[in-house]
A protein has these predicted regions:
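Ankyrin repeat structural motif
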Residues: 16-24, 50-58, 86-94, 120-127
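Ankyrin-repeat inter-repeat connecting loop/turn
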Residues: 30-31, 64, 100
Length: 132
């Protein structure tokens, strides 16, 4: 993986929105970088609960429905928000076009993830969007 890709993944995981902005200013394509699991900076920032970083990545054109297909789950950022019970981030992802019924590689939707991980706040949000 190129060094700039490693840097943006690390910065997204840390919630270092200034670093993410700087990297994207240098190379806009970095919003689509992937780690060894196929997770994008948007997956990473979502998983860790970094709302400001998620908002910036979305404004910079990150794919809200990207699947991390290199691992055994194949989840989208909305699956990550469901898993981590990040309701504010889930709402932002949905407002930017996230598919509330996207299926991971095991056929599970974000709603399935909320049930398994007891993510009640995200489950309630997804219900309001008629997610299954």
């Amino acid at each position: 993986m190129p060094e700039a890709s490693k840097e943006i993944i690390r910065a997204a995981k840390k919630g270092d929105v200034a670093k993410v902005r700087g990297l994207v200013a240098t190379d806009a394509g970095l919003v689509h970088a992937q780690d060894s699991d196929g997770s994008t900076p948007l997956h990473c920032a979502t998983w860790k609960g970094h709302l400001d970083t998620v908002a910036f990545l979305l404004s910079a054109g990150a794919n809200v429905n990207a699947h991390n297909r290199n691992d055994h789950w194949g989840t989208t950022p909305l699956h990550a928000a469901a898993h981590a019970n990040q309701a504010a981030i889930a709402k932002l992802l949905i407002e930017h076009g996230a598919d509330v019924n996207a299926k991971d590689l095991n056929g599970k939707t974000p709603m399935h993830h909320t049930t398994f991980h007891k993510a009640k706040a995200v489950a309630k949000l997804l219900q309001s969007y008629d997610a299954i």
